[in-house]
A protein has these predicted regions:
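Active-site-adjacent structural elements that line small-molecule/cofactor binding pockets in enzymes
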Residues: 1-339
């Protein structure tokens, strides 16, 4: 199992230092997200000073950028990292695409993302092999690529494309044509086994691929410490985050996979602005299903037991204050996960 560092929202120029620290702790990969900053600029800083790490976006929002724009950014990062870049894409939701990015939302995110990836790969094929650019789909059309705008071939042209999603359609799309899939941190083993993996495997089989062709990646809610008191403190922060996700109708299917019926109550509380009361509505047993609860000395094995071969890469959505302040213990946990 590989272990990845997720760069928190911060200025791109600080990513180099963060990457060096991540490498020193033994992390395998360095992932960025599109939140308060562009997801690509931190990687340009980090890749220069941490040549032993893999890099990826988790995720970059696809639809506000054209496939050709995204293709060029990924191509340049694949060149800079010498093939150690993984392009992670997400669809976001209508409100963000339309109101935050002022872009069009066609209402068919999975079919649109399929075309988006096909169009990007057509651009890369044109640059690498000289294939005339000709892509025609329902949402995207590309037919112009002159030598002046062609960056030319690179050593590692097969840029891995990962997508993120919650529901069955994007899980299936990953199985059909992607190199990897970012499992949303708000998940349970039941949801992986009943929704994500079956849909992914079915689509992979229909496309003459296998589940092994899709690397599954996720971040984990970690609730840990050296004592019961420290673990309970760690739970409190996770409980608040879980209450937020559970209140969002988009994630309701995760609750349904475990027969949990308290999602609508949280939604109603959020609409009333009762944010400070929502965490108390999350039952204790739910925390152990959406995250990992274990003392530090057995944390790595507990994560391995939870995921088995369900995922191949993990990161830490939360660590708890005890582990965050103990680099030696964190380094050991990372090493144990990798062994």
């Amino acid at each position: 199992m590989k272990v990845d560092y997720y760069y928190p929202p911060g200025p791109p120029e600080k990513a180099g230092t963060a990457a060096q620290e991540a490498a020193a702790l033994g992390y395998d990969g360095f992932f960025t997200a599109e939140t308060q900053h562009d997801p690509f600029f931190p990687i340009t800083h980090a890749a220069v000073v941490a040549p032993g790490l893999e890099f990826g976006t988790a995720i970059a929002v696809a639809f506000p950028r054209s496939p050709a724009v995204m293709a060029m950014t990924a191509w340049d990062l694949a060149r800079q990292t010498e093939g150690r870049f993984m392009l992670g894409l997400g669809t976001q939701v209508r409100a963000h695409v339309v109101r935050r990015f002022a872009s069009m939302w066609v209402g068919k995110p999975a079919p649109q993302l399929r075309e988006y990836i096909q169009a990007m790969r057509a651009v890369w094929d044109s640059w690498q092999n000289g294939t005339p650019l000709q892509y025609e789909g329902e949402f995207y059309s590309l037919s112009l690529m002159t030598p002046f705008f062609n960056p030319g071939p690179i050593r590692s042209p097969d840029v891995p494309v990962y997508i993120a999603g919650v529901g069955p359609y994007l899980s299936a799309l990953a199985g059909e044509m992607c190199d990897g899939f970012h499992v949303h941190p708000f998940h349970t083993v039941a949801y992986l086994d009943e929704v994500v993996l079956p849909n992914m495997e079915k689509a992979a089989t229909e496309a003459d691929r296998s589940l092994d062709d899709v690397e599954r990646v996720t971040t984990v809610f970690i609730m840990t410490g050296n004592s019961d008191e420290e673990i309970e403190q760690s739970k409190a922060a996770v409980r608040q985050q879980v209450s937020f996700y559970a209140s969002t109708p988009s994630y309701r299917s995760v609750l349904e996979a475990s027969d949990w019926d308290w999602g609508p109550e949280l939604t109603a509380m959020s609409k009333r602005g009762e944010w400070d009361k929502m965490a108390a509505a999350v039952p204790d047993e739910a925390l152990e299903e959406v995250g990992v609860v274990a003392p530090i000395d057995s944390l790595a094995q507990t994560i391995k037991d939870r995921y088995g071969d369900r995922v191949q890469r993990v990161g830490f959505y939360s660590l708890g204050s005890t582990l965050m302040q103990d680099n030696d213990a964190l380094r050991q946990v990372i090493s144990q996960l990798q062994s």
